[in-house]
């Protein structure tokens, strides 16, 4: 019991304990505000995603951390949601919560119709029409695309993959972090 520092927890005064709990809440709320600020700056509901499969190899490996941008990348032109063929986008299929990272292989847009995209994983043999919502042959750029990939950090996302595949690790990690914040004195 003493190895975890729980004996120190008993000796904390209520005011010290409350201070440590509030410090932990401050850390969590700061992380949340940074995430929301990044979401606003990138115009993306999820500005950072992790590659979950090998469908984009060799460009991206499973566990790579991707940075997304959903604003116009060309600063000298008027803002448009233009996406080029060959660009790598991340999208959510309507009704599913898993972000998919694939390359745009074709685009269609009429004078009065929204931009529609056809995507395909670099390591896949066929395009993504099987992944789209039933009866859909293309993605609606405005409604389904989360953002375009502008950078990445290799393998850093494996931490989130491990926490998703082993829920007990998430609980243990949060418990240890909370305990360290409460027990540690400044």
From Swiss-Prot:
Residues 172-183 are annotated as: C-terminal short (CTS) helix. This is Signal peptidase complex catalytic subunit SEC11. Its EC number is 3.4.21.89. NCBIfam families: sigpep_I_arch. Catalytic component of the signal peptidase complex (SPC) which catalyzes the cleavage of N-terminal signal sequences from nascent proteins as they are translocated into the lumen of the endoplasmic reticulum. Specifically cleaves N-terminal signal peptides that contain a hydrophobic alpha-helix (h-region) shorter than 18-20 amino acids. Residues 42-186 are lumenal. The active site is at 55 (charge relay system), 102 (charge relay system), 128 (charge relay system). One of its GO terms (cellular component) is signal peptidase complex. Component of the signal peptidase complex (SPC) composed of a catalytic subunit SEC11 and three accessory subunits SPC1, SPC2 and SPC3. The complex induces a local thinning of the ER membrane which is used to measure the length of the signal peptide (SP) h-region of protein substrates. This ensures the selectivity of the complex towards h-regions shorter than 18-20 amino acids. SPC associates with the translocon complex. The chain crosses the membrane at residues 21-41. The keyword NAD does not apply. It is a single-pass type II membrane protein. The C-terminal short (CTS) helix is essential for catalytic activity. It may be accommodated as a transmembrane helix in the thinned membrane environment of the complex, similarly to the signal peptide in the complex substrates. The keyword Magnesium does not apply. The gene is SEC11. PANTHER family: SIGNAL PEPTIDASE COMPLEX CATALYTIC SUBUNIT SEC11. InterPro entries: LexA/Signal_pep-like_sf, Pept_S26A_signal_pept_1_Ser-AS, Peptidase_S26, Peptidase_S26B. One of its GO terms (biological process) is signal peptide processing. Belongs to the peptidase S26B family. Residues 1-20 are cytoplasmic. CDD domains: S26_SPase_I. It catalyses: Cleavage of hydrophobic, N-terminal signal or leader sequences from secreted and periplasmic proteins. It is found in: Endoplasmic reticulum membrane. Keywords: Endoplasmic reticulum, Hydrolase, Membrane, Protease, Signal-anchor, Transmembrane, Transmembrane helix. GO terms for molecular function: serine-type endopeptidase activity.
């Amino acid at each position: 019991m003493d190895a975890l520092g729980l004996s120190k927890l008993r000796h904390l005064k209520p005011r010290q304990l409350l201070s440590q709990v509030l410090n932990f809440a401050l850390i969590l709320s700061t992380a949340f505000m940074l995430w929301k600020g990044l979401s606003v700056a990138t115009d993306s509901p999820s500005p950072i995603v992790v590659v979950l499969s090998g469908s984009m190899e060799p460009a991206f490996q499973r566990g790579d951390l991707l940075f997304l941008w959903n604003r116009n990348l060309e600063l000298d032109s008027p803002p448009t949601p233009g996406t080029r063929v060959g660009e790598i986008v991340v999208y959510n299929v309507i009704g599913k919560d898993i972000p998919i990272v694939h390359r745009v292989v074709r685009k269609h847009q009429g004078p009065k119709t929204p931009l529609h995209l056809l995507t395909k994983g670099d390591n896949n043999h066929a395009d993504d029409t099987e992944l789209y919502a039933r009866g859909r042959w293309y993605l609606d750029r405005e409604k389904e695309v989360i953002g375009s990939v502008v950078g990445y950090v290799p393998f850093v996302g494996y931490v989130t993959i491990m926490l998703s595949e082993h829920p007990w690790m998430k609980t243990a990690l949060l418990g240890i972090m909370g305990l360290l914040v409460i027990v540690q004195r400044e």
